[in-house]
Amino acid sequence: HPNLPKYLKKFVIMGGGTFGNVTKSGETAEFNIWIDPTAAKQVFEKLEVWMVGLNSTHSAALSREDFNDMIKLCGDGEKAYLVRELSKYSQVNSFDKGQDNNVIHDALAVASVINPDVLRFEKHYVYVEDGDVINNGQTVIDLEDKSGKEPNCYVGMEADKELFAKIIKEMCAYYGSLK
């Protein structure tokens, strides 16, 4: 909708990044952009985007201890169901494979809206590749501002992992306190 930008205070996405997770030829595209790169390209061209990409979400990976703390803070029963399931997923997806942490990608995007200090952003020009066979869906970030194009995106660079864990645990404690 052409009037949408004037109604938005801030447009934050979990997608893109300085590396990807889907293409076989070097993992240049991130799934949320790759699934519809033409639409993503329009978004980046029409809106000022705050991009929480894979590079930033991976910098906020949580440990097994963090997940155990989250379960304890949520309490028993249905309140802890989602956290327990997320912990099971982390066990299979990461911990059983020898990794010592796991990422809750979308939660970092939400946390960056709640508390902007959780993520360091830099403003750069970002182009979405939507025609290249090999790099289709890649977010090309002009980190050195060589293109001469006006920066159109706040790119999440690195998370404050401790602050992110604190925000997540505070949320779990809140839900754990509900009757």
Language model features: what each stretch is:
Residues 34, 52-179:
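Conformational coupling and interaction surfaces
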